[in-house]
């Protein structure tokens, strides 16, 4: 008999489903924002301001929690602002049904500026590439 000390795949799935229950939103932020692992909740501090952007960001659509092997991961559609005229450095994904609980911080690597359409393109829908995953 062998033991493999681990968080079970089912526990990962249930935890991620709990985070994804309700409404998930993506808010965009300027380079002046201070977001990271210690971020607790959504804040308007240093949130993007500009044409086509509304405080609080956009609702994530087609949210699905999946598993592959021992990884649970979250998939959702690309997030689009159209029209758009603003600059963003990163984003916060948060859950409005859990007191605006911060779920994930995304760093775009540099300022991204648009005067037409702004799209946050999600990676492949796989356990190895998803933006939010419990491995």
Task: Write out the residue ranges for each language-model feature.
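Small cysteine-rich, disulfide-bonded extracellular modules of the LU/uPAR three-finger superfamily
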Residues: 1-89, 96-135
């Amino acid at each position: 008999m062998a033991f493999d000390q681990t968080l079970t795949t089912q526990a990962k799935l249930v935890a991620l489903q709990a985070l994804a229950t309700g409404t998930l939103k993506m808010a965009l932020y300027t380079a002046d924002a201070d977001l990271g692992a210690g971020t607790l909740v959504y804040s308007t501090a240093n949130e993007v301001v500009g044409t086509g952007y509304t405080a609080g960001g956009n609702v994530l659509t087609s949210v699905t929690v999946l598993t592959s092997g021992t990884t649970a991961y979250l998939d959702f559609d690309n997030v689009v602002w159209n029209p758009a005229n603003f600059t963003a450095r990163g984003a916060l994904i948060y859950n409005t049904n859990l007191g605006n609980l911060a779920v994930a911080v995304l760093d775009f690597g540099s300022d991204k500026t648009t005067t037409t359409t702004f799209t946050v393109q999600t990676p492949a829908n796989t356990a190895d590439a998803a933006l939010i995953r419990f491995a």
